[in-house]
Amino acid sequence: MSHITAQLNSGTVVHLSNGRHQWKADEPLQLHGTDTGPNPYELLLSSLAACTCITLALYCRHKGIVLDSVTATYDISQIHAKDCEECDEPTKGFIDRIDSQVQIDGDFDEAQQKRLSQIVERCPVHKTLSKGVAFSENVSFR
């Protein structure tokens, strides 16, 4: 289980901590932020990209496959639901769409290439985003 604490004192800079590491998020100048850190969508995409790279590395280590490097690039955008060719259910309005480009470097045979392509979608963050999330929210005031 992962745990993150976020604190905003003023402006748009949010200080984040998991108890061992600290980092921050912000909005770009055009959204009235100070651009001192990645925005929330960039943090989401960085989680997905890191998970993809780590999942591939751990799989290769487990199978004894030599992996030279992985570069994962993700973009998020909103598209009209009617333009979504991958969507199972018809939806109205806009949907969020994540596009990826994953470059896996190494000397792989055809079977390994096929399997590594499948492993990309097996990263836990990808699975979470694909199947949806149940939220339990508790808001308090003082």
Segments (PLM) and residue ranges:
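Extended beta-strand/beta-hairpin segments
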Residues: 1-46, 57-142
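Alpha-helical metal-binding/catalytic segments enriched in His/Glu/Asp
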Residues: 48-52
